[in-house]
């Protein structure tokens, strides 16, 4: 089967039936201007409405006081601003907040991580995940569907609404967004890219492209396409120093091996300004699986031609997982080897693990609709991005 990369189009402008309303959260600025053009309005109306939507977290047309009453009435007839609702909130002792967010009859999870100098939101891109990484709780839930643009950017909107809109508080509620929640973002490009465009847009959330990070496990055809679509920071879920280990814990490696993956990564960062010439390597530490000093030496040799910084992630356990968490001493020895080679190496501080909000622990509530044949194809054959 040949790879098919799905790119953003104007599908969001299509109303499924005459009684349905267009959810304006599904539209990036280009699509929003097309929407107002079709209403017979000037393009600047799109900018006005987006400013209300994202700077004030406003979802009521009647509150948009610089828009005339007639147009507000028209908007109420054909459009809505409907973000997914929070159905459960958990707060960690370290300040981390995890929200379970309803998307249809299921849930995804979004995590807010406040720090002294920043506030990061971890956003989901799919209901579940089809890649079956063995150390990840989300992967064990199976896969159901891709999230729509409104369900992705809606997580950011809802979090900002709860924490406090910038125009209301005077403080930016979210400084960084990481596409590291449930799902593989590159298997949902047609929705993830427009959502990230809204994150970057001055009339959207206005984030710097260096503060929006997409993390991928290695869907190479989509990564090759991504650089022509948008420029954001890139993090890669490597987790192994060789193909033998990675084949076992990250099954997509059987299709796109480490060499192929890193070649694609170098191609992306060579034309990216957001990455400042280097990529973030994510490496989960699994006890006596990939955490020996011999693995550290091997990883250093592997990455010698890839400008990068390395995040070592203490593994966060979940019920039934076949792994153990590396000891602090093993992580420390691993880190020291990498630093001796000159790599910037950071041991990620675990946040929110007491509420299962830490890396690899997000599970949501997923009805698994992944066909077994599709899973096997993803491990050993070409991936049809459109089919997932």
UniProtKB/Swiss-Prot annotation:
Binds 1 [4Fe-4S] cluster. The cluster is coordinated with 3 cysteines and an exchangeable S-adenosyl-L-methionine. PROSITE patterns: RADICAL_SAM. The keyword Ribosomal protein does not apply. GO terms for molecular function: 4 iron, 4 sulfur cluster binding; metal ion binding; rRNA (adenine(2503)-C2-)-methyltransferase activity; rRNA binding; tRNA (adenine(37)-C2)-methyltransferase activity; tRNA binding. Its cofactor is [4Fe-4S] cluster. It comes from the Bacteria. This is Dual-specificity RNA methyltransferase RlmN. It comes from Klebsiella pneumoniae (strain 342).
């Amino acid at each position: 089967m040949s790879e098919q990369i799905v790119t953003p189009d104007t599908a969001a402008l299509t109303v499924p039936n005459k009684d349905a309303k267009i959810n304006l959260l599904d539209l990036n600025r280009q699509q929003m201007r097309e929407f107002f053009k079709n209403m017979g309005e000037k393009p600047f109306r799109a900018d006005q409405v987006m400013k209300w939507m994202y700077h004030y977290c406003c979802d009521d047309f009647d509150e948009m006081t610089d828009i005339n009453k007639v147009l507000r009435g028209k908007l109420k007839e054909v459009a809505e601003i409907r973000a997914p609702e929070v159905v459960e909130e958990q707060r960690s002792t370290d300040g981390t907040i995890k929200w379970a967010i309803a998307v249809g009859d299921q849930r995804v999870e979004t995590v807010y991580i406040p720090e002294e100098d920043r506030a990061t939101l971890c956003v989901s891109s799919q209901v579940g995940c089809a890649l079956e990484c063995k150390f990840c709780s989300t992967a064990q839930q199976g896969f159901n569907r891709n999230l729509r643009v409104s369900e992705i950017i809606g997580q950011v909107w809802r979090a900002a609404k709860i924490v406090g809109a910038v125009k209301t508080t005077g403080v930016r509620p979210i400084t960084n967004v990481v596409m590291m929640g449930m799902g593989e973002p590159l298997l949902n490009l047609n929705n993830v890219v427009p959502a990230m465009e809204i994150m970057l847009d001055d009339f959207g959330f206005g984030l710097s492209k260096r503060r929006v990070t997409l993390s991928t496990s290695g869907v190479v055809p989509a990564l090759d396409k991504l650089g022509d679509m948008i420029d954001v920071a890139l993090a890669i879920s490597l987790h192994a120093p060789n193909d033998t280990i990675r084949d076992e814990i990250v099954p997509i490696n059987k299709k796109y091996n480490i060499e192929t993956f890193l070649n694609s990564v170098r191609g992306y960062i060579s034309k990216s300004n957001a990455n400042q010439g280097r990529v973030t390597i994510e490496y989960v530490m699994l006890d006596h699986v990939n955490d020996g000093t011999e693995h550290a030496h091997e990883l250093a040799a592997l990455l010698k031609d890839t400008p990068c910084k390395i995040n070592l992630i203490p593994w966060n356990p979940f019920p039934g997982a076949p792994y153990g968490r590396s000891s602090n001493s093993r992580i420390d020895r691993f880190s020291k080897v990498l630093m001796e080679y000159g790599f910037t190496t950071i041991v990620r501080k675990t946040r929110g693990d007491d509420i299962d909000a830490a890396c690899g622990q997000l599970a949501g509530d997923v009805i698994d609709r992944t066909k077994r044949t599709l899973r096997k194809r993803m491990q050993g054959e070409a991936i049809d991005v459109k089919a997932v």
